[in-house]
C-alpha cells in the first residue's frame, strides 16, 4: 500500500460480523429508506435462527417474552428477510454467507474471549505499527458497529476506554483511529466530542453520519444533520483539531466521507447496483450538507 502512495489505512477488528443491521430497507416518513438495528429482531435471530447455545442467558425474562412474541408474529418471508439482512453484513463479499457456514464460524469465534481478543489486537499493533511508522503510513482502526456485543461476539473497539487501550498498547503517530460518528453514536454512553478532544491527534480518517436512537435500544441511520449525534458539535471539534494541527505546523488534512446514505429518488430503482448503505444520491446529499456545515463553522471560528 505504501508503495502505491496509500498513506491512510482504515481497518477493523470485528470478528465474523462487520456492521450489523436487522432491516436494510427501513421506510422513513419522507419516502426514503435507511438501515436499522432492532435488538428485538437481533435477539430473535440469535435464539431462533442462529440457535446459539445458552443465548437465552444473555437476556432477561421480560425481554425473552417480547422476543418470543415478536418471532411468532413473523411470516416465513419476514424470517427470511431478517436472516438475509443480518448475513448481508459479512465482510469481503456482496454475497450472502450460508447460514450453516456462519454457524460454524460463529462457534469458532465464541471460543475467543474479550480479553484474549484485546491481547490479539495489542499483539497485532506491536507487530504492524513500527513498520507502518517507517513507511509513513497511518493505521486507522474503525469502531465496532454497533458498539456492543452481538450474538455473544465480543466487541473491543466500542467506547472511550477501549479506544484508549488500543492507543496505549502501542503509542505511535501511526497508531490511530477512524472516527465514525455513526458507529460510536449508536451508544448514548459515548461522548463523541470528548473522544475527539482527547484523541484528536490520533484521528486519521473521519466517517460522518447520524443515527436516531430509540428508548427500546433500537436505532436507525438518520439524516446526516438530524438525529441523536450532535453533528454541529462534532464538526466544530474536528475543525478545532485541524486548527490545533495547523498551529503546530502539522498536516491538517484528514480524509473524510459522508459514510452511509439514505436510498432516495432514482437510487430506489437500482438498489442491486450498490452495497447497502452506499447509495449515490443519499451520500452525495450527506456530503453537501456536511461540507456546508464545515464551511459555516470554519468561517465562524476563523473570522
Regions found by a protein language model. Give the residues of each.
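Residues that cap or delimit alpha-helices
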Residues: 60, 71-79, 83, 200
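Flexible glycine-/small-residue-enriched beta->alpha junction loops
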Residues: 21-51
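Metal-cofactor-binding active-site regions of metalloenzymes
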Residues: 8-13, 42-43, 67, 73-80
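Generic preference for hydrophobic/aromatic residues in regular secondary structure cores
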Residues: 35-38, 82, 245
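Helix-loop segments that flank and shape redox-cofactor active sites
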Residues: 145
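Histidine-acidic metal/acid-base catalytic patches
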Residues: 2-8, 17, 43-53, 59-65, ...
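Aromatic-lined carbohydrate-binding surfaces of glycoside hydrolases
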Residues: 11-23
Amino acid at each position: 500500500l505504501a508503495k502505491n502512495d496509500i498513506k491512510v489505512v482504515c481497518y477493523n477488528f470485528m470478528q465474523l460480523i462487520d456492521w450489523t443491521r436487522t432491516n436494510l430497507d427501513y421506510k422513513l416518513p419522507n419516502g426514503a429508506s435507511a438501515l436499522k438495528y432492532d435488538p428485538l429482531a437481533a435477539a430473535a435471530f440469535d435464539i431462533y435462527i442462529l440457535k446459539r447455545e445458552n443465548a437465552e442467558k444473555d437476556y432477561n425474562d421480560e425481554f425473552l417474552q417480547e422476543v418470543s412474541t415478536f418471532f411468532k408474529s413473523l411470516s416465513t418471508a419476514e424470517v427470511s428477510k431478517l436472516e438475509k439482512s443480518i448475513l448481508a453484513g459479512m465482510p469481503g463479499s456482496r454475497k450472502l454467507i450460508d447460514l450453516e457456514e456462519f454457524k460454524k464460524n460463529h462457534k469458532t469465534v465464541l471460543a475467543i474471549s474479550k480479553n484474549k481478543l484485546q491481547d490479539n489486537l495489542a499483539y497485532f499493533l506491536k507487530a504492524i505499527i513500527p513498520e507502518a511508522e517507517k513507511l509513513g503510513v497511518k493505521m486507522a482502526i474503525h469502531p465496532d458497529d454497533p458498539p456492543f456485543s452481538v450474538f455473544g461476539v465480543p466487541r473491543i473497539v466500542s467506547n472511550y476506554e477501549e479506544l484508549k487501550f488500543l492507543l496505549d498498547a502501542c503509542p505511535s503517530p501511526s497508531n490511530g483511529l477512524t472516527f465514525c460518528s455513526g458507529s460510536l453514536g449508536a451508544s448514548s454512553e459515548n461522548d463523541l466530542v470528548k473522544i475527539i478532544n482527547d484523541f484528536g491527534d490520533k484521528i486519521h480518517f473521519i466517517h460522518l453520519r447520524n443515527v436516531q436512537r430509540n428508548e427500546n435500544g433500537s436505532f436507525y441511520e438518520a439524516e446526516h444533520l438530524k438525529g441523536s449525534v450532535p453533528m454541529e458539535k462534532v464538526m466544530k471539534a474536528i475543525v478545532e483539531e485541524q486548527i490545533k494541527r495547523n498551529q503546530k505546523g502539522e498536516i491538517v488534512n484528514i480524509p473524510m466521507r459522508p459514510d452511509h446514505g439514505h436510498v432516495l429518488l432514482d437510487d430506489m430503482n437500482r438498489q442491486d447496483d450498490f452495497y447497502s448503505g452506499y447509495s449515490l444520491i443519499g451520500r452525495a446529499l450527506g456530503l453537501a450538507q456536511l461540507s456546508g456545515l464545515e464551511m459555516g463553522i470554519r468561517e465562524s471560528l476563523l473570522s
